[in-house]
Amino acid sequence: MAPTQNLFLVAIAFAVIFTASTVHGRHNGAEDIVHSSCEHASYPSLCVRTLSSYSGPTITNRRDLAQAAIKISLSHAQSAAKKLAVVRDSVGKKKQEKAALVDCVEMIGDSVDELSRTLGVLKHLRVSGGSAKEFRWQMSNAQTWASAALTDDDTCLDGFQGMDDGEIKTEVKQWMTKVARVTSNALYMVNQLDETRGKPHDVHL
């Protein structure tokens, strides 16, 4: 084989190895951030499981992590909203669950809107080049929206308290408990982002 061909093959092999090691390093870095950040979340195991399986952009810092957590929560809320709407429309007006379902659909709709607003704030968060005052204002908005979303999730669940157990109640509790838990974890990540912000020039968020 000619020397030129040998060099070409060596170059290709090196490129493949370098790319693989880089991807592996990023993956390990993301796993480290996820595990360390989820340790004190409201639901640590769920936190690790959902964020580890996140298929969005690579998580390289805490801002990425907070955005990923909110996206996961938003996805669960949107899925639950669709299911709840179907159940609401299929239940007779005289059923005791009807009023609770109507309220729950409204609550989860508000939750979806609030999580979307939270995500919008995080996407435009000034982690560098901005003043501490501006950062605090942005974080206050993100925390307010995420907290409101969690409140709406809990309010939906509260609407079924005192009702007889049944298929509808069981399904709604299952869906909304999952939404509330991932939202609680997401709120924790947003709060952690605020606590670890540091100075205005800190870009390792």
Curated annotation (Swiss-Prot):
CDD domains to which the protein is assigned, alphabetical: PMEI-like_3 (cd15798)
Organs and tissues of expression: Expressed in apical meristem.
Cystine bridges: 38-47, 104-156
UniProt protein name: Pectinesterase inhibitor 3
Gene Ontology biological process terms in this record: regulation of shoot apical meristem development
Taxonomy, superkingdom: Eukaryota
Any one of the GO CC terms: apoplast
Pfam families: PMEI
Entry keywords, A to Z: Apoplast, Disulfide bond, Secreted, Signal
PANTHER family: PECTINESTERASE INHIBITOR 3, PECTINESTERASE INHIBITOR-LIKE
Residues annotated as signal peptide: 1-25
Classification of source organism: Eukaryota, Viridiplantae, Streptophyta, Embryophyta, Tracheophyta
MF terms (GO), sorted A to Z: enzyme inhibitor activity
Role, per record: Pectin methylesterase (PME) inhibitor that can target PMEs (e.g. PME2 and PME3) in a pH-dependent manner, mainly in slightly acidic conditions (pH 6.3 and 5.0) but not at pH 7.5; this processus relies on changes in the protonation of amino acids involved in intermolecular and intramolecular interactions. Regulates de-methylesterification of pectins in the apical meristem and affects primordia formation and phyllotactic patterning.
Protein species of origin: Arabidopsis thaliana
Family statement: Belongs to the PMEI family.
Entry's localization field: Secreted, Extracellular space, Apoplast
Induction context: Down-regulated in leaves during infection with Botrytis cinerea.
InterPro entries for the chain: Invertase/methylesterase_inhib, Pectinesterase_inhib_dom, PME_Inhibitor
